Amino acid sequence: PQPMKAQLDKTAHYYDLKTHPGQVVVLKMQVKNLTQTTKTVRMIPEPARTNPLGDVVYDRTVGQAINPRLGFEKLATGTQKMKLSAGQTRYLTVKVRLPKTMGNGVIAGGLHFQEVTAQRQRSQQQMLANRYAYVLGVVLHTGYVKKVAKVNLQARTMGHQIGIGINNKANQFVNQVKVTQTVKDARGHVVHQAAVQGKQLAPNVTAAMTLDQHTYQPGDYQVTTRFTSKTVHQTVTNNVKVK
């Protein structure tokens, strides 16, 4: 992506822009062919979605669209195709037209770049199956952008596993998320530790997840969960019973 003054997170490798209702957001990017042969590339705008774990994903077969009423694919320039000779760099412009009546909120999507091959041109099904070769994320904020300072956390049992329920009530993404859990038995001995990191939590989402596939014997456990991100740092301790 080309740098923009409206970029909120200067360290992000995707568009994270402050916008306003009615604005036409112009996204400029360069596409380079690093191979020694001519390539044809197709760009397709798609909405961002939330999977059952609360993660932001760009696969239209998974989960629910983020802000479906204002679908990113409806607002952005349609599919574009370009041919690049070996080593060639070309510039691509995508316009996103924000409704004047949209109010405050977040619109999220992805620009999907894929190589077009003769096989994909012959088979639409094959093209769809391989459409997510590379995704450039786009997050557009209108109104006051409030940093997420807290999420709701609650350890819970899922059969013979121990996981965590997460609720992000804010209309903002939570980036660079790391979740760790330390589980102690009734005698206070640490019986298991687990962690996941690199998650991006969607806005207005409630999700439940386990950090790994570890199973527990029936009994009482104390679970300490630590949730950290760019703006959130919190720890909660809960008692749970595995039956």
Residue locations for each model-derived region?
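Short, solvent-exposed loop/turn segments enriched in Ser/Thr/Gly
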Residues: G22-K28, R90-L92, N104-G110, H160-Q161
